[in-house]
Amino acid sequence: MQQARVRLAGTAPEDLDDICDDVREIADKTGVTLSGPVPLPTKTLEIPARKSPDGEGTATWEHWEMRVHKRLIDIDADERALRQLMRIQVPNDVSIEIVLED
């Protein structure tokens, strides 16, 4: 049977966990096997920026960072389960990718 690999990425881990719970509920209702969610390493993007807008004075820096959290879920590619997966309400800051594998 085909497997569907669901990759979730977002800046808020709470949103990712909520979507993972929704996927787990869908798997329980439809009776398909589910493995995951597997937490992948968090990427930290850091940008140093000067505090002073004109460049004069002492060199003081601010460091801005954004953390990207990722989750990985494998689920059997049942037609009913995939249709329900497509109907999940996904927040704007979460990206979801579904890939079918043999």
UniProtKB/Swiss-Prot annotation:
Highest taxon above the source species: Archaea
InterPro entries linked to this entry: Ribosomal_uS10, Ribosomal_uS10_CS, Ribosomal_uS10_dom, Ribosomal_uS10_dom_sf, Ribosomal_uS10_euk/arc
A GO term from the CC aspect: small ribosomal subunit
Parts of the chain that traverse the membrane: none
GO terms for biological process, alphabetical: translation
Spans annotated as Disordered: 34-58
Residue runs in coiled coils: none
GO molecular function, one term: structural constituent of ribosome
Biological function: Involved in the binding of tRNA to the ribosomes.
Protein name: Small ribosomal subunit protein uS10
